[in-house]
Amino acid sequence: MAITVLSNIFTIIPNTPPLTYTAGLYKRTFAGYHNENPSFFATATPATYGSNPATSVQTTIIQEPSSDDGTNFSVQWLGYFKPTTTETYTLFISSDDGSYLWIGANAISGFTTANSTINNGGAHGPVEVSATVSLTAGIYYPIRMQFGEIGGGDVFTFNHSTPTITKTTNVTGKVFYNSITNGL
């Protein structure tokens, strides 16, 4: 943190690391089900990790295909959602099994199942849950999505809509990650 003195007026400027936005979200896949515990992702070792570019028609759907056995794995996506219009957005998660979404400050730290923007937790078949948030065009909003599969079918899909945008999985030009920190 830097402190500048100007005529006995102190201005505190936070020492913020530079952000380098790259299209897509940063994705980590883990062996094991998260058991409705968001801190699972902080202590487990990722089996795979890397970016999910989400930049072409084929990859604009944030969707995790089945693992080899189709059971007992978890996935976390980190990054930023940059709205193209200033509106009320409806965010949707459809999942089988448990999933959560945080957008804004809670996506960075202090995230719990209780303060998630969308809570679609528990072992269940395909269920869609939504939430509405007011977002401003051009602002990078931190976003965190967590999904786990514990048995049966497995699917995770993120959609969004507004009064002027039809419900879509297309996130081209709307999701980014910090390539310096691999996520947020």
Each model region followed by its residue ranges:
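Short, aromatic- and glycine-rich surface loops/edge beta-strands on solvent-exposed regions
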Residues: M1-A2, M145
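Interdomain boundary/hinge segments at the C-termini of tandem beta-sandwich modules
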Residues: V5, F10-P14
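Acidic/polar, compositionally biased interaction segments
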Residues: N15-L184
